[in-house]
């Protein structure tokens, strides 16, 4: 049978010891794997349970979610291919095969590709930038971060066309695109991230509800813009937007398809 155990949110040393103990108790000789994924765990729970059932108690998966990031701790008997099934099932969701944050993985890929990053944030208000510069050595690959919160800052600092904001609004595909384009045109960067949206609790409408977010990620070759409506309070919407933006940048740097249709995040 499969056993479900709630682990602590940071998988601290006591939790690792507990995890190892459970592995010996339940499985005897076993392997431990960590998989980092992007997406709500509710969307994945049934498929994870199916993987556990397929191995008749030879594999156990412990999930923990923070925002849109899910950490899977996989225990399985030595030689059991359960973790391979996890990779196959959630390939588009996985961003790391070790316990590493989105921002850290993003910087690692910038280093490997020898690329520089610039960020323009509206609703996220510096959350992406702050998270990135928590990492030592970020200055080697992180060039610039702007909080362009007002319409005038978007037009003055990023060269967003005032007519675009007038016709489509600050929260739109078009504005997000121009924000990223402004970074690429004016900044010293190879890849750009831009966010604009309605964090709430006020400011929403029928056509543009609270939680509506546009995220642009691009290079000099192409800019992709993604639309999402994130649920939750103001902080949760901002966190989800920040995490999604970094995940998209990771996918772009890894040359993965940016078709997001198969990944549910809200």
Model regions: which residues?
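A short linear hydrophobic-aromatic micro-motif
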Residues: 56-62, 190-194
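Short beta-strand-to-loop capping motifs
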Residues: 36-39, 72-78
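Proline/glycine-rich low-complexity loops and linkers
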Residues: 1-25
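Gly/Ser/Thr-rich loops at beta-strand to alpha-helix junctions
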Residues: 10-13, 41-43, 122-128
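Short Gly/Ser/Thr- and Asp/Glu-enriched loop/turn motifs at secondary-structure junctions
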Residues: 65-69
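Short alpha-helical segments enriched in small residues
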Residues: 4, 17, 50-51, 79-266
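Short glycine-/aliphatic-rich beta-strand segments at the starts of folded cytosolic domains
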Residues: 25-43
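Short amphipathic alpha-helix segments
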Residues: 38-60
